[in-house]
Amino acid sequence: AGIINVHLGDSPRCMDLIEQVIDETEIPASQFLPTHVNRNEMLFRKAITYALKGGAVDFTGNEDIDYWETICDEVRVCNGMKRMLDAGVNPNRITISSDGQGSLPIYNKQGEFLGMGVGQSSCLLKEVKECVERTDIPLEIALSTITSNPAEILNLKGKGKIEEENDADLCILDQELQMIEVIAKGKTVYRI
């Protein structure tokens, strides 16, 4: 069975329709992966409740973290993850994704459109680093949000863990959590 990746917006209904489907049908929470759960505080609080019931949730990482927190009122990923973990959410049910190569409109504080940016997948490692350095989330938990957790939740066989018979996809980091080498299917594709 597939997974439905639900992109959440600013609607005051938040996750109500997902919860209605789960409550009123035979479709389990494991079939849904709501993303952008850190879009605003109200949605984020609903996401905590949803995750405490066993649902998986996905934070959207951003390259310009301060902009999205201060101008757009998003819940900063590291702060949101810390709050979820402190609330008792299973860390294996949390992922971070990017809007890599997606369009990102840029607004000022008055909500006026200033231009268009492009989402970067490089934000994932930046968000993991913030989780570790700003909120003391253990590195293995922070890393799992972009490795083993999405692979498990999305049923990606051979991905997400270093195990025999899995694809040999690795990112080697230095002490400052900077990427120094990338190995894809056992072959080095990037090295500083």
Regions found by a protein language model. Give the residues of each.
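His/Asp/Glu-enriched, well-ordered alpha-helical/loop segment
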Residues: 86-166, 170-172
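Context-gated lysine
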Residues: 46, 53, 82, 109, ...
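C-terminal cap of metal-dependent C-N hydrolases
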Residues: 161-192
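Active-site core of metal-dependent hydrolases
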Residues: 1-107, 113-114
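Short secondary-structure transition/capping segments
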Residues: 17-18, 70-73, 108, 152-154, ...
